[in-house]
């Protein structure tokens, strides 16, 4: 059974372990928790929770962003985030939604599921046209985006831009 849970400052060792499994940087997805101590992870949870409630742009670039975890039968298998609006830089790389599945849970359809659920959440906060970018060589993510209604609108030497209209 699938469940998408919003990040909580009370998230525990199961989420910490998931974030240790997800590489620090892979296919344009950055995971700042990989390599942190459990105490540092708990501090990260507080910061990420605050980002969700932020108003406007912070530090000249950080937009409000809500983080979620995909659970399968009670086990966290992936994470994703929704950026509430876009800066010019995020229009080039990043877009509204970023997501990643732990390497040990890939090729099971979980990427498609987390993106489907993140799209629903994005609609719930008022985002009607969703931009998602992916690396040119990230074929798995391209398939996931297309399966969720993504339309390729632009391609550069490094990235593909997709819009999902909800």
Report the location of each language-model feature.
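Short aromatic/hydrophobic contact patches that present stacked aromatics
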Residues: 3, 98, 131-133
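Conserved GNAT acetyl-CoA-binding A-motif
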Residues: 122-133
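Conserved catalytic-core motifs of GNAT/GCN5-like acyltransferases
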Residues: 133, 146-164
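Conserved beta-strand-loop-alpha-helix junction that forms the acyl-donor binding cleft
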Residues: 132-142
């Amino acid at each position: 059974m699938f469940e998408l849970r919003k990040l909580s400052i009370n998230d525990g060792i199961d989420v910490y372990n998931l974030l240790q499994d997800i590489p620090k940087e892979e296919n344009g997805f950055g995971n700042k928790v990989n390599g942190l101590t459990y105490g540092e992870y708990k501090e990260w949870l507080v910061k990420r929770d605050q980002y969700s409630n932020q108003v406007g742009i912070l530090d000249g670039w950080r937009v409000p962003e809500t983080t979620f975890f995909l659970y399968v039968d009670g086990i966290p298998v992936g994470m994703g985030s929704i950026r509430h609006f876009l800066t010019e830089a995020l229009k080039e790389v990043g877009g509204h939604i970023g997501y990643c599945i732990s390497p040990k849970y890939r090729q099971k359809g979980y990427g498609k599921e987390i993106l489907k659920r993140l799209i629903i959440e994005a609609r719930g906060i008022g985002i009607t046209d969703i931009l998602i970018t992916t690396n040119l060589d990230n074929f798995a993510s391209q398939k996931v985006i297309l399966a969720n209604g993504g339309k390729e609108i632009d391609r550069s030497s490094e990235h593909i831009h997709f819009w999902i209209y909800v």
